[in-house]
Amino acid sequence: MKKTLSKKSASMHSVSEKPASKRPAVKPAPSVAAARAQLRALSDPKTLAGLSRYAIPSDGAFGVPVGGIRAYAKALGRQHALALALWRTGQYECRMLACFLADPEAITPAEMDAWTKSFDSWAICDTACFHIFDRTPHAFAKVRKWARSRDEFVKRAAFALLASIALHDKEAPDEPFIASLPLIERAASDERNFVKKGVSWALRGIGKRRSPELRKHARALATRLAASEDASARWVGRDALRDLARAVAAPKRSRASADTRKSSR
């Protein structure tokens, strides 16, 4: 039985802490064997021991902290061919590195589908969506396709991707997000832990967009789900409402703090 992953523990592991900057390839790509050897050299026993606590399969893993993988990726730059080769190894850190090296402009819809079908943890799923997939022109089409999947991590990918687009694509129009709300509503009753948390993430992301219209639609859906007779849908709705309420309160606190500072001058 898979362990429940709290928001706090997810943030501690920090696979999705911020979008990766677009990096040109700065030197010839190493071989897959050389990249594996470098990752193995970065291994940490404590990190390896902790993977299972975050519901990440540890069989064959090296135990490399995510920060170490990111730093190595930054040194290599974009290396799409190497990323594809690393992905084919199936090894955890190799696949994490692949997510940071892959070129969103080069990855094809077929490659996206192939990667997604082989996801075996939320960490790989979210990192691919957050650092590659949301920057492709295929993103919304994949949200619609993957949301219909019965596979737990493919379905999570649909909503992790939707959440990532909501966060990163500041210029995206409202329409594709509004069109995605029925997908959220249908998936909210999926009781599987990683699916329902992905669904909540997507709903919260849409509800935090700058558009008042989107915020209104997202809050209305969250309110409707919170009143559902289905336990999973009710959890998604309540989780989203709590987070959206905090998001509304935060600017008010910031303004109040600013006013206090001004009045004390």
Q: How should each PLM-predicted stretch be described?
A:
Residues 2-8, 18-265:
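Alpha-helical scaffold domains
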